[in-house]
């Protein structure tokens, strides 16, 4: 178990130096504690500079170095992830050059994905069209906006499409929600979205059990619980939609089942029946479930979900300092748990913990990767596996009350 994460030896709390100047924080034992002592404004400015330098490196490695050719188009590991990072940079800095470069990336992804049968936001053509439409609207390019929106509306879902987030109906539905949030409700009609919601409930009830877990789904023969392929991801998307009373009851019942059947450690199973308490990732384990429980706490305002979200956060603090940098199964993704809990509770403890995980990355990740003690990711510049996701998270910490896990929180 210990091989997957670094032991978290960071203090439970480090008070900020009230002088407000980075140069005055000099009496600390080490560089990590010095970062933790910085006032948040100084700290976020430091993160901001570092994030923009990483963004430039990601653009070079994934876009310019290849001669602007796209082999892998998707948001998870490909060039669309670079486009999304550029869009985040534009949102934070208002630098239109980033927005224009974002659209340049999207257009290349559009060409590369034209024959793709994948229809989700993170791993499919829906992500290309959705991000393209939103970025074009921000730039004021009405012709391009209309083109991407029309292409999105032209997407048809295969009858054998699974239900999970990365490749299934939940992932398509998330793309619809993303569009409606950024360009206006009913951009994608409620009727169209409702038909997808109903199909997700129909399938989930077939495999579920009213007395235990009302909704259940399979992906490649396994009944996953996590954010990427399982219950947490599907419930998260459903809670962003208008549901009928019986549907709300089933979502709440499914989440309660997961809480009641988690590991004694507080971590969550990767799949139904699993006895292996190893994974503390966004994709599998407590981090992704925590984000879903925060959403449940916001929507249903019940003590059960608030407490369970905070308990999942304790697992992440204890075992979430992973030996990877990315957002899917790395420290950057786990940092979002604390940002989400801070948004829910406004408890400064969670902002400190987000600051601590980000400080660890800022202070140690380059050295640990170069020494082989930390993994830079199979696709080291990508949004979900590599430093692209780290840059995105660091930019998000500019305003922690608005920080949202990309492709998951809305």
From Swiss-Prot:
GO molecular function, one term: abscisic acid binding
Coiled-coil zones: none
Similarity annotation: Belongs to the LanC-like protein family.
BP-aspect Gene Ontology terms: abscisic acid-activated signaling pathway; carbohydrate metabolic process; maintenance of seed dormancy; peptide modification; regulation of abscisic acid-activated signaling pathway
Binding site for Zn(2+): 283, 328-329
Domain of life assignment: Eukaryota
InterPro entries per the UniProt record, alphabetical: 6hp_glycosidase-like_sf, LANC-like, LanC-like_prot_euk
Function: May play a role in abscisic acid (ABA) signaling.
GO-annotated cellular components: extrinsic component of membrane; plasma membrane
Keywords from the named record: Abscisic acid signaling pathway, Metal-binding, Zinc
Name the UniProt record assigns to this protein: LanC-like protein GCR2
Description of the deletion phenotype: No visible phenotype under normal growth conditions. However, in growth conditions described in PubMed:17347412 mutant plants have decreased sensitivity to abscisic acid (ABA).
PANTHER family, per the entry: LANC-LIKE PROTEIN, LANC-LIKE PROTEIN 3
Keyword Membrane applies: no
Gene3D superfamilies found in the cross-reference section: 1.50.10.10
Summary of subunit composition and partner proteins: May interact (via C-terminus) with GPA1.
């Amino acid at each position: 178990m210990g091989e997957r994460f670094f032991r978290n030896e960071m203090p439970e709390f480090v008070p900020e130096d009230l002088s407000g100047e980075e140069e005055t924080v000099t009496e600390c034992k080490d560089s990590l504690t010095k970062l933790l002592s910085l006032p948040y404004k100084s700290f976020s400015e430091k993160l901001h500079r570092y994030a923009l330098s990483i963004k430039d490196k990601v653009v070079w490695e994934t876009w310019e170095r290849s001669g602007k050719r796209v082999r892998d188009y998707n948001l998870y590991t490909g060039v669309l992830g670079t486009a999304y990072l550029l869009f985040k940079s534009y949102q934070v800095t208002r630098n239109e050059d980033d927005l224009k470069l974002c659209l340049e990336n999207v257009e290349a992804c559009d060409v590369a994905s034209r024959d793709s049968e994948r229809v989700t936001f993170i791993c499919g053509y829906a992500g290309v069209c959705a991000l393209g439409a939103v970025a074009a609207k921000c730039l004021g390019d009405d012709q391009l906006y209309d083109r991407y929106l029309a292409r999105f509306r032209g997407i048809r879902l295969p009858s054998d499409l699974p239900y999970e987030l990365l490749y299934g109906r939940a992932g398509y539905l998330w793309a619809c929600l993303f569009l409606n949030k950024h360009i206006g409700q009913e951009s994608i009609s409620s009727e169209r979205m409702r038909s997808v919601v109903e199909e997700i409930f129909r399938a989930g009830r077939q495999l579920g059990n009213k007395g235990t877990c009302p909704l259940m789904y399979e992906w490649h023969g396994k009944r996953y619980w996590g954010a990427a392929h399982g219950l947490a991801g599907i419930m998260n998307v459903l809670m962003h939609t208008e549901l009928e009373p019986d549907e709300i009851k089933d979502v709440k019942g499914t989440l309660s089942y997961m809480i009641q059947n988690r590991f004694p450690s507080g971590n969550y199973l990767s799949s139904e029946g699993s006895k292996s308490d190893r994974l503390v990732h966004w994709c599998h384990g407590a981090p992704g479930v925590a984000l879903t429980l925060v959403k449940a706490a916001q929507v249903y305002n019940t003590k059960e979900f608030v407490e369970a979200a905070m308990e999942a956060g304790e697992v992440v603090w204890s075992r979430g300092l992973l030996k990877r940098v990315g957002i899917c199964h790395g420290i950057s993704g786990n940092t979002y748990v604390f940002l989400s809990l801070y948004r829910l509770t406004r408890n400064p403890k969670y902002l400190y913990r987000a600051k601590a995980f980000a400080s660890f990355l800022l202070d140690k990740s380059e050295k640990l990767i170069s020494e082989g003690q930390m993994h830079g990711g199979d696709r080291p510049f990508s949004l979900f596996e590599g430093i692209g996701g780290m840059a995105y998270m660091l930019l998000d910490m500019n305003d922690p009350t608005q920080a949202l896990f990309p492709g998951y929180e809305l």
